[in-house]
């Protein structure tokens, strides 16, 4: 394994996130990786993971599953449209677009539609439910990356814990087993 990596000379050996510095430091996401993106509220975690999902599914055509425990499919798709179009969000939301921007918007929406991205916005998803859905997506669509937005809203149904921290820890361990 180390010998194989040395032949790659710093190349991405896993799945590229589309963020050059991150890919350089991690060599891409490897099949056994569980990566947690954590930060204080309103720091851009959702925007970051949506950008990675877009880079993987739209640009690299890698099948991605995105489980959002906080936002609806519509909210996520709207954010992704703004992300891929490179048109200010206010203009898209208001519909005040120049003719060339309508064309750009149409093209980018088609790109998103054609991308191998599978979004699930089931609220209060349990670890068991997520694992079941994720395994089905892997089996039926060849999903290679699973992104969970807002892990703290997930529950470990049927189990009791002394603290929420213990529950999140158990959820994380269970997800690693995916």
Roles of regions detected by a PLM:
Residues 41:
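The conserved Walker
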């Amino acid at each position: 394994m180390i010998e194989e990596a040395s032949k790659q000379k710093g190349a991405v050996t896993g799945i590229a996130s589309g963020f050059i510095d991150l890919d350089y430091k991690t060599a891409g996401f490897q099949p056994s990786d569980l990566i947690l993106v954590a930060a204080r509220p309103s720091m851009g975690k959702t925007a970051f993971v949506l950008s990675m999902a877009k880079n993987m599914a739209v640009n690299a055509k890698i099948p991605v599953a995105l489980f959002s425990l906080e936002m609806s499919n519509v909210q996520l798709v709207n954010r992704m449209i703004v992300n891929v179009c490179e048109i200010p969000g206010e203009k898209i939301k208001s519909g005040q677009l120049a003719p060339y921007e309508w064309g750009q918007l149409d093209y980018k929406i088609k790109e998103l539609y054609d991308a191998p991205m599978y979004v699930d916005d089931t609220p209060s998803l349990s670890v068991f439910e997520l694992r079941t859905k994720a395994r089905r997506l892997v089996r039926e669509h060849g999903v290679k990356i699973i992104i969970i937005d807002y892990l703290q809203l997930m529950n470990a149904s049927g189990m009791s814990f002394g603290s929420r921290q213990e529950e999140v820890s158990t959820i994380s361990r269970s997800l690693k087993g995916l």
